[in-house]
Amino acid sequence: MLRLKSLKKPVQAVVRRFATTSAPTLSVGDNIHGFNVLRTKEIPEFDLQATLLEHSTGAQHLHIARDDSNNVFSIGFKTNPPDRTGVPHILEHTTLCGSEKYQVRDPFFKMLNRSLANFMNAMTAQDYTFYPFATTNATDMKNLRDVYLDATLKPLLRELDFSQEGWRLENEDSKDKTSPIILKGVVFNEMKGQMSNAAYAFYIRYLEKIYPSLNNSGGDPLVIPELTYEGLKKFHADHYNPSNAKTFSYGDISVADHLEALNAKFENCEISKTPGNTERLPLEFSSAAENTRIVEEGPIDTLLDTSKQHKMSMSWLMGSPKDIYESFCVKIISSLLIDGHSSPLHQKLIDSGLGSSYSPNTGLDSAPGANIFSVGLQGVTESDLTKVETVILDTIKTTVAEGFDKGRIDGLLHQTELARKDQNAKFGMALMNGVLPGWFNQVDPLEALEWNSVLDRFNKDMEADPEFLQKVMKKYLLDNKYFHFQMNPNPDYEKNVQEKEDEILTDKLAKLTESDKEEIFETGANLEKMQEEPENLDCLPTLHVSDIPRSKPRVALEHTKNPYPIQWRLAPTNGLTYFHSISSLEGLPHEYYPFLPLFTSSLTFLGTKDKTMGQLEDEIKLNTGGLDFSVSCSSSPLSLPSSQLNFAMDGVALDKNVETMFGLFQELLRNTDFTNVEKLKTMIAASTANLSNALAQSGHSFAMLRAASDISPVKKIDDILGGVAQVRFLSELAAKSEQQLVDEVIPKLQEIAKFALTREQRFAVTCGQDMQTKNDELVRKFAESFETNESPFNISSLSIPMTTPTSTLFKLPFQVNYAGIAIPGVPYTHADGAPLQVLANMLTHKHLHREIREKGGAYGGGASYNPTDGFFSYYSYRDPNLERTLQTCQEAGEWSVKKDWSSSDLQEAKLSLFQRIDAPISVKSEGMALYANGLTYEQREKRRRQLLDVAVDDVKRVAKQYLVNPSGYSVAALGPGYETMDKKKWTVLE
């Protein structure tokens, strides 16, 4: 899995109040299992004890002791990419294809359903690669740790695995040696999909230019075919050894247990000095005589205005991540400059309409070796590019001169306080993600964990010098040169890339002898034979269904009426109150549905009649952890046709600020200025750009939803609210003039607002026992304020026109396809739901993964069954062989009926399902299954027992009943499609 820090911001570390574990205390200088203790540190603000150790081989280990049963482990290596062949990325894939101890094909995917881990993955970052997992089961921890260590340190690295995961030449039809020879490979196709994403293309080209010493770790599809098998093995030998390793553990399992396992592996490894694996630094442009300027070409987005597809950014060096305090200060500056409606750059760049949204690299990036602050815009016209640059510089100069409002600084610090108090069930993973990037680049991991001392120093500096932040800004942003990066849209970009790929293929084919072609055909046959061979998986460790408890404890909930229905979850919350409200939108005419996402976004974007959104946002940040509005459609657990369209409000605040939170909700709900057409147009442009980018990142999700929308009223509404239908709707709105928005859109939003305020609400509150009485009074007052409003519509039942199921292709300028197929299932309480859920998992792991990914070359593919929506789905992700995939899925039901399923197959599917079912959740999520979805404890317990009791005969029966002879079958795909598509069977939408 490719992981890009700047496109996927790391999870903000948040804290659940635990005591530190009672593990034996280690002292500096102690030696345990070959590891010397370098440093230890208590971090009382996070209730943890951190220990940094070093093995005799040079490997470092960071252990975070905390009384948390959700233990985390990771092994990682510094992997500076030597070129753009994607060797770190391909190696990440290939190491997981078998090891000395576990000589089976793809033990990583095999362990996905032999474990109860709530997280398992492998990720390639810009300059390091890591393999993390999390589990609450001690035996599971031991099993997975051994598999991960053996996979990374002792992989088989077979040439056929390299061909499958990296790239290869192969006959298009692997059974016909006369068929054309083409380029294939999982990573090759994954990166073709990535490069089709305009946001990714901008970011990666920017990164290559500002970090010329740091190549594209994911790989450029036009360069990937230059990587050799020998090059892969050498990169592993040079980089995947203990002297270059950093391991991490977190939780209540003893550090000695981890160190003993690591020592046993490290002692049997050859130690080699890793060449050229030092910290990589960006261009030293800050002291150059002139600002550095780079212009590149990139893909266009056909869903956006073709005249507004320029992207640009300006970047400044802002010190080293090794200076923890300085880095904290520049993070504060970055947030104050760009985050939210009250930030000066948001007002000048986005509110002004100069662009649709920030450029993909906007923000502070502290990896790999420098703090780089970037700000820019996308959705810019060519004529405005120079103006954008001038506006950015002038805004920074003005801010340095005038400073930031103290209320904004206080609001930002208040958000950090709330983040620390918020109870997160995946704190260990968040901690790991926060520490690793710096640790791999010589940032002290123990210093990086400190919080109170950094915050205390910042408060003292601000008190001593109110212009402290202005001086830091002047030092880095005014007194230094910047790096200017620009990407111009080229309508022929995808065509040119394809032509270059064709040239690479033609050049390779021209050098082939008849003997080479015969060898290519034989290699393809051997690869397919390897993929088909049954395996003995007895060497792999596994948990058992007996390790899954048949019952889960009931969460203590209270239900009261005051006279409004409230669900209470009374538990320790670190002084926070979590508030939820749901009201039915039944009776809203269906022609208003596409406007609902705009309505909810407007509430936190447009501002009110008396206050700008910037002013309101400052109040929200200073008094709450955020206010959120959303709409969703859900099915009844008892009957799929029974559905509910809901408007929801969610908020969190310190107990002392709950009344203020309700006041802010009132302000937004009653007084939002929907006539603010300039802000509305800006919001539509930003929403369109964001959803368009999501298509290229998660196209399979959009395809699955679109397919389901043809056979389910609930999914039809979901597609209108957040699927392809919403993308197309927003694209149409983005092309409208301000006057058209005034005439056609604003009245709809005003009517929805009036309607939403008439609906009866039900509430859920999670808080401490001592706050129940006070919160009960506040909720009652809040609810009473809505009673006098009348609906502008005649109330009717929820209904929406349906279309005939079909096969739909949304033709998009991608290099690969995304596909979704939907088949009706049953309601949550139906007895067949459990075997359908098990069947989907078995099909994915025992058939579709092999057929779609290993053979077909797609990055991913499988089946899923959503128990609450009652839909069976097939999907593929970044798929070069759409036609083959659709045929495979169509035949999957028959394959399931004929398959001789084993008891092991059944057990593995159940283990895999319960990874998610039994994953730890935060206190704020407890009771939400009942509140949001209407699922009672008794219904969920019955479903649990049904899943555990599913037999092979049940799986075969539902496969025949629902998949072989489905009552409905709908297909949707996003991408270029395939050459032999029957236009009579497909509806093609541009």
Curated annotation (Swiss-Prot):
InterPro entries linked: Metalloenz_LuxS/M16, Pept_M16_N, Peptidase_M16_C, Peptidase_M16C_assoc, PreP_C
Cofactors named for this entry: Zn(2+)
Location in the cell: Mitochondrion intermembrane space; Mitochondrion matrix
Annotated residues for binding of Zn(2+): 89, 93, 190
Active site annotation, chain numbering: 92 (proton acceptor), 165
Record's protein name: Presequence protease, mitochondrial
Cofactor note (record): Binds 1 zinc ion per subunit.
EC id: 3.4.24.-
One GO term describing the cellular component: mitochondrial matrix
Family that this chain belongs to: Belongs to the peptidase M16 family. PreP subfamily.
Gene name of the encoded protein: CYM1
Main location: mitochondrion
One Pfam family cited in the UniProt record for this chain: Peptidase_M16_C
Targeting presequence: 1-25
Function: Degrades mitochondrial transit peptides after their cleavage in the intermembrane space or in the matrix, and presequence peptides; clearance of these peptides is required to keep the presequence processing machinery running. Preferentially cleaves the N-terminal side of paired basic amino acid residues. Also degrades other unstructured peptides. May function as an ATP-dependent peptidase as opposed to a metalloendopeptidase.
Sorted UniProt keywords: Hydrolase, Metal-binding, Metalloprotease, Mitochondrion, Protease, Transit peptide, Zinc
Lineage of the species this protein comes from: Eukaryota, Fungi, Dikarya, Ascomycota, Saccharomycotina
Gene3D superfamilies (alphabetical): Metalloenzyme, LuxS/M16 peptidase-like
Subunit and partners: Monomer and homodimer; homodimerization is induced by binding of the substrate.
UniProt record, GO biological process: mitochondrial protein processing; protein processing; proteolysis involved in protein catabolic process
GO molecular function list: ATP-dependent peptidase activity; metalloendopeptidase activity; zinc ion binding
SMART domains per record: M16C_associated (SM01264)
